């Protein structure tokens, strides 16, 4: 209770100090101008930062000259004991009297394979910065992370110059930007981002002025229109849903490790245990010091916890539940030195992510304008003129990673430890040091982190023989589809097949689709391979299927139908003799076509909630939808031949929806914040609508579709065209630029500049 009172007194004093600076209740003419404390942007003589002019200069000098001695000067400043800035600053490493020769320690080349660069999207940082990190990490056989913004197709294979610009880790975030079959197949590791260290609970946000045409092309969105990822993944509302997404992604690339990114928080150990049971091979515990570039300041300074807390809890909880040797634990969040990595390993980490430090080696000077597109060194900007100032090279990032590994080896040699695996979980080599005589630091107790009852267990790191078994050999794809289509894929000839399915056949068609992508990219003609399925489709039917593959389902399907559709075609209709009315028969479940990027879907029945959420480019025809249809949509075309649920088109910033409004009540159910609702009058719109309904009837034999086509003149006035304001404005501007004689590409650029001035 005494400690509690003292803590409250500290807090009270802080509040009173700030209050007295902001108010003058007695009218004493006190200057209430608030001076900058330097908490966010560094100010001379104010709050100290680990990245300051001195450390930034030394780090850049060391990595650009390849001088390890200068790097040691940098880490000496970072690790100095005065003014503790993080929890690891309160820890001592307990060295024995005698270590071992550094020649006996695991090599630099081996250690750097455990290093990764953090998830920074192409869009938040420049192409030059993004590619430089990818090249560097591929040179080291480590891994770079694409972030959530997709990746240009020309980077997915080794370039003509022999450089590999492909990010080994492909991230799948709630926005699903650029998540295609090709994107997933190119990955060595696929990371599901549940949250971000600096802003847990918030979705990603790319301001409109950073959505240049080339970014919009990669993300399949509209230039100049801000991109906001939903706060949750709409296919993850429970741990079972997460297990389903992990399974989907394993089917989309059976050779990739599946990783789940969590944020350090109280209780993260319980979540990590669930994630391990769900089949993830890597669990990332992200600290609050990371990912601060464009996060809101309120989140940067008030949300998240240090990685030391979450990492220790996750490691101990997984060990306690007998799950530790099934997964790799990774951590990130301002790892700056070999000492930081050593302590992270002792607390339970086996792999390590770096983000800010590689940016600094490439030229970042911590101007804190990442979200403004005004980065003066060409790192966090898309502005072509500012990008010319980029001076980074892959060699600088390589030097940084190798220097970190070398410093780590020196610590391991002094500890008498030969391999990094032997260091994992060795909290007995750490102790709390008493550097603070007063203030809150003096009250900190690290015993829950350091007193690990499982520390004497030697096998407390990942062992590949314990990896989760997805039993893919039992899937319909492996047992039937891949075998039946093998000869056709070898020759590129057309082939069709008819099979029976049950709702236990999850993620049907995805393994086959991934193999088609590996062999043909997206170059096949439509309907090259067709599978007619009779029965009930399971979860994630047709997820991520590519161009050339058609799945025709006579029956119904569960949730996540057509998730991430990547050019394939999906057709669903009830069996002959069905007595249900199509516009009253819910034939597919919730969250269909989530994150679809291209392809077509024709559904002779009603879809559940969140139909086409985050659709980026697919075309779909359906006979009705549940609530929140077309939510967060950025591209593509949707035709609804019946009623929608409430909140239709919420967050929709691109694409077009045509909705049949027979009782003129649609206006009550549309979220009008971002969209307009108008009659279908443009001749091109009329032609498009009629063509899509014609295709729908041809594929599904829809009675409603036939009736509309037979009486098209009568039904046309009942259709409403729903289109986002900004999307419409941008398309009109592009047309105006093209009328001036500009090419399509140049017209987009000029329209973007005109819209974002």
Where are these regions (language model features)?
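Terminal or standalone catalytic/regulatory effector modules within metabolic enzymes
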Residues: 10-168, 227, 426-434, 439-558, ...
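Short, small-residue-biased leader/transition segments that mark boundaries at the very start
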Residues: 2-5
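Generic recognition of stable, solvent-exposed alpha-helical segments in well-folded globular domains
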Residues: 10, 50-54, 66-69, 110, ...
């Amino acid at each position: 209770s005494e400690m509690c009172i003292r803590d409250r007194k500290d807090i009270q004093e802080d509040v009173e100090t700030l209050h007295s600076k902001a108010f003058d209740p007695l009218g004493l003419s006190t200057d209430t101008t608030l001076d900058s404390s330097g908490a966010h942007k560094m100010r001379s003589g104010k709050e100290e930062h680990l990245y300051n002019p001195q450390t930034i200069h030394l780090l850049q000098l060391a990595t650009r000259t390849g001088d390890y001695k200068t790097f040691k000067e940098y880490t000496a400043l970072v690790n100095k004991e005065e003014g503790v800035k993080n929890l690891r600053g309160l820890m001592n490493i307990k060295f024995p009297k005698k270590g071992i020769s550094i020649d006996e320690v695991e090599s630099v080349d081996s250690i750097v394979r455990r290093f990764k660069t953090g998830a920074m999207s192409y869009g938040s940082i420049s192409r030059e910065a993004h590619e430089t990190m990818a090249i560097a990490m591929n040179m080291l056989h480590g891994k770079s992370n694409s972030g959530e913004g997709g990746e240009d197709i020309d980077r997915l294979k080794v370039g003509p110059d022999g450089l590999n610009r492909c990010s080994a880790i492909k991230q799948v975030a709630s926005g699903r930007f650029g998540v295609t079959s090709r994107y997933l197949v190119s990955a060595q590791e696929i990371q599901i981002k549940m949250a971000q260290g600096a802003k847990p609970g918030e979705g990603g946000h790319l301001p409109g002025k950073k959505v240049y045409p080339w970014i919009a092309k990669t993300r399949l969105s509209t230039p100049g229109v801000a991109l906001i990822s939903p706060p949750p993944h709409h296919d993850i509302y429970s741990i079972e849903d997460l297990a389903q997404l992990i399974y989907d992604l394993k089917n989309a690339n059976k050779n990739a490790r599946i990783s789940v990114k969590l944020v350090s928080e109280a209780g993260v150990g319980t979540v990590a245990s669930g994630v391990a049971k769900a089949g993830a091979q890597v669990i990332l515990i992200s600290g609050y010091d990371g990912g601060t570039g464009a996060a809101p300041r309120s989140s940067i300074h008030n949300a998240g916890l240090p990685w030391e807390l979450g990492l220790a809890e996750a490691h101990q909880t997984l060990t306690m539940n007998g799950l530790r040797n099934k997964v790799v634990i990774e951590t990130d969040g301002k790892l700056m030195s070999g000492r930081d990595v050593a302590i992270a390993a002792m607390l339970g980490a086996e792999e390590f992510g770096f983000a800010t430090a590689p940016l600094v080696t490439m030229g970042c000077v911590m101007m804190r304008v990442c979200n403004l597109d005004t980065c003066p060194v060409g790192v966090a900007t898309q502005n072509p003129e500012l990008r010319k100032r980029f001076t980074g090279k892959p060699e600088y990032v390589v030097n940084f990673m190798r220097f970190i590994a070398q410093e780590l080896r020196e610590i391991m040699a002094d500890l008498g430890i030969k391999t990094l695996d032997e260091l994992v979980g060795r909290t007995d080599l750490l102790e709390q040091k008493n550097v603070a005589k007063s203030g809150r630091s003096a009250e900190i107790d690290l015993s829950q982190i350091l007193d690990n009852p499982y520390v004497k267990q030697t096998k407390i790191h990942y062992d590949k023989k314990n990896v989760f078994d997805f039993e893919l050999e039992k899937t319909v794809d492996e047992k039937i589809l891949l075998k039946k289509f093998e000869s056709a894929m070898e020759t590129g000839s057309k082939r069709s097949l008819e099979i029976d399915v049950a709702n236990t056949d999850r993620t049907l068609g995805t393994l086959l689709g991934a193999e088609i992508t590996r062999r043909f990219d997206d170059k096949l003609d439509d309907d090259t391979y067709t599978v007619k399925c009779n029965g009930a489709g399971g979860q994630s039917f047709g997820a991520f299927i590519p161009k050339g593959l058609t799945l025709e389902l006579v029956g119904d399907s569960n949730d996540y139908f057509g998730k991430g559709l990547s050019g394939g075609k999906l057709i669903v209709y009830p069996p002959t003799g069905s007595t249900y009315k199509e516009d009253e028969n819910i034939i597919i479940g919730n969250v269909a076509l989530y994150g679809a990027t291209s392809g077509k879907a024709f559904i002779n029945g009603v879809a559940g909630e969140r139909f086409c959420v985050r659709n980026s480019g697919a075309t779909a025809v359906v006979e009705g939808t549940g609530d929140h249809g077309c939510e967060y949509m950025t591209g593509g075309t949707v035709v609804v031949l019946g009623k929608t649920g409430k909140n239709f088109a919420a967050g929709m910033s691109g694409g077009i929806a045509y909705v049949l409004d027979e009782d003129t009540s649609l206006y009550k159910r549309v979220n009008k914040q971002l969209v307009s609702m108008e009659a279908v009058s443009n001749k091109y719109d009329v032609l498009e609508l009629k063509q899509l309904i014609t295709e729908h009837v041809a594929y599904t034999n829809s009675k409603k579709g036939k009736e509309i086509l037979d009486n098209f003149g009568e039904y046309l006035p009942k259709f409403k065209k729903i289109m986002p304001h900004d999307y419409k404005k941008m398309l009109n501007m592009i047309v105006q630029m093209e009328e001036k004689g500009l090419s399509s590409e140049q017209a987009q650029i000029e329209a973007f500049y005109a819209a974002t001035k």
